[in-house]
Each structure stands twice: as C-alpha cells, then as structure tokens.
Amino acid sequence: MLMAVEGPYALMVQPDDILISPREVDEHFGTMVCFHSRYALGDSHNYMDKDDFLREMYLDTVGHDEAGLKRYEHMVNIVSSRFRHGPKTEEQAVDDAMLKVISEKYITLPLYLMDHSGLAMQTTSFNDPWDSGQVGWIYVSKEDALKEFGGEKMTGALRKKAEDLMRSEVAAYDSYLRGECYGFELYKNGELTDSCWGFMGDLADVCKDMAEYLPEGCKDMVDHLEEQDHPATIIKTLLKHAKIQVNQAAKAFEHTPRQQVIGDAR
C-alpha cells in the first residue's frame, strides 16, 4: 500500500482485489481470439482451434461459397507440398499463406503469452521458447478501421493508427493479467470522503491518472506517496486524524452559546 498525508487528508493507494477483464467492461476496437489449454484468454468465441479460426477468416475474405472452399483447399495443398521439406514447418507456411489473404480484408496482430510466475501478453515475441508462445491474434476489419478513424480507403497511416489502438488494448489486457489494477481512498480527518477503483497499468502512470480524480488541493499528494506495509501505522494515522476532528468538534461545542445547545437538543 502507498500512503501520503497532507494536512487533514490521508491518501491511500492499493491493489484492487476485484479484477474485471477490460474485455468485459470496455468497448473495444479489436477482437482478441486466443487458444490455450488451461486459460480462457481474450474475447469469448466459438472456434475449435486456431486452424478453424484462420479457415473461417480466410473464407470470410474470399467468400463462403463453393469457389471459396475450392480456393482454400487448393491453397492448402499447394503450400503444403512446397514447404513439406523446407525451413518453415508445413503448418506455419499454411498459416502465413492464409494470413496474407486475410490481410486483404483485416488488420491482424499476433498475441504472445508469457506464462512464468504469472501471465503477461504482448504483440511481439517474448523470445522465450520455454515459457512463452503465440496464443492467438487481435484483429479488426479494414471497414471498421475506416469508420473509426475516417477515410475512404486504407492507407499506411490509418493502418498504423489501427495497429497502435489494438496494441493499447493488448497493453490494458496485459495489465489485467499481471494484476496491475489499483484504487485509491481519500480520508479527511479520518473519515472516508472519496474513493475510485479500476485504474490499470504501471503504478507510476496510474498515480498520475488518479490525480485527475482527486479534489483540488489534493492532486499533488500522488507525488508524495510512500510505501506503507504496517497496518498499525495506517490505523494510527487515521485515528490521529479522527482525533483532530473530535477535538475540533469539542472546541466548537465549547464556544457555542448555551441557549443554542439547548435549542438544538430540543
């Protein structure tokens, strides 16, 4: 837990124990399709495996008809025969060939998972064949990308915007997988006055975001947060502020005219 004290205020920043996937609560631009034997990752889908997914995306690009099926079967046979004894595996060669066709209609990025003392995800390889590997893709149709950013045809600049937005969504999901989710509680004179949860990302960046939700006069408290792991110290700080509040109330009571006190009591 991080804590900062300034005047009558005490700000506490701590992990959010109720983690909700950003894929469930946020509107997202890209669609994340993942396949893993132990974890349910990304967005929900009905594909049996990655081959089923790529096949459907391929047919969606060339056409879900007899001609499309024949083109698919012909492509698989040709690529398989060419790369059966080449440097690429036959499976990878077929995947690459399908993705090349799929790219005519969709913008895709690969998704890699690191599974070592926790989970992490990104769109580039972790270069760790033992504990990481590709688990799927995030994609968006070019049509939806044009609607999002405006424009009549896909350009390199628009493609980059689409890819960057999908990368940002993967980064948010990565924070969720890592458990990088936080919230704050703001106390005044020992009494909770404000709180907000669900901030995701690197803690330093999260604290800057939290400042936007704090009242004026408290925003700079995020710059003075310090690690505080002793519950007794935290409780002592809150009790100290509560005592100040009680003392202030007592002094106000002492200076209140007796007639007013009696009237208030009635």
PLM regions: where:
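Acidic interaction surfaces
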Residues: 1-266
